[in-house]
Amino acid sequence: YLVSQHASDYDVALTEEEQQAIKDAAAKFGEDNSDDVKKVVSGDEEEVTKVLELMTISNKMETAMEAGVDENVSDEDAAQKSMQYLLFSYTTTDDSGESQTLSDDEKEALKTTAQAFDDRLKGGEDMETVASAAGLTAQTATFDSESTSPDKDLIAAADALTNEGDVTDIIETESGIYIAKLTSLLDREATDSKKESIVSERKQEQYDSLLEQWKKDTKIKEEKKVWKKI
């Protein structure tokens, strides 16, 4: 309701087509529902009309309130890198489908295996080929320095690489051992998606800021008698 009070400030109003569509929808609600249902939801035709009007105005106001936001985002501000990575997990699944955690000795043996893979990758071998031969699957991910998935230590190590094709040392974590290869310093698709996300955040911040200011400027009266009925 607060948003609709400021509609005139943005020259936002319902068109004749929208008013007719709302009228038709409210009438259909009245036809399709019994008096008992209407009573439960406090939804007589007049109330439904009012709610639909407010919802429509609110949707139109959202666009108006977000207008003027700076939509320019540089590649530098939104840059997303991409990598391939392997996980040598400390958890296995037995024949009954139960998860089992490796013993300390098994973890040490796995570390030796992972180090051998790391050496081969640093020697120039293809990650997918090396992984496939060992029954592993090379995963891909896009990221920046603030990413935390799939693992923050993996992200930090991959983000520290300076050249495409560089490979991390083995990365020991609580869940297993990672190895990553930097495949792109600027993944175009992921970077463009991040730009859209940044613009959306800016719009939301502007919307929320306006709404908060309007709340401060509006005296909200608490109807105690009404609250007692709720």
Feature roles, as predicted:
Residues 1, 55, 120-124:
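Residues at alpha-helix boundaries and the short loops/turns that link adjacent helices
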Residues 1-42:
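N-terminal targeting/tethering segments
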Residues 18-28, 142-149, 228:
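Short linear loop/turn motifs
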Residues 20, 35-116, 132, 149-230:
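PPIase-associated folding chaperone regions across multiple families
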Residues 120-128, 164-166:
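Glycine-centered tight-turn and secondary-structure capping sites
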Residues 127-137:
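Short, well-ordered alpha-helical segments enriched in acidic and aromatic residues
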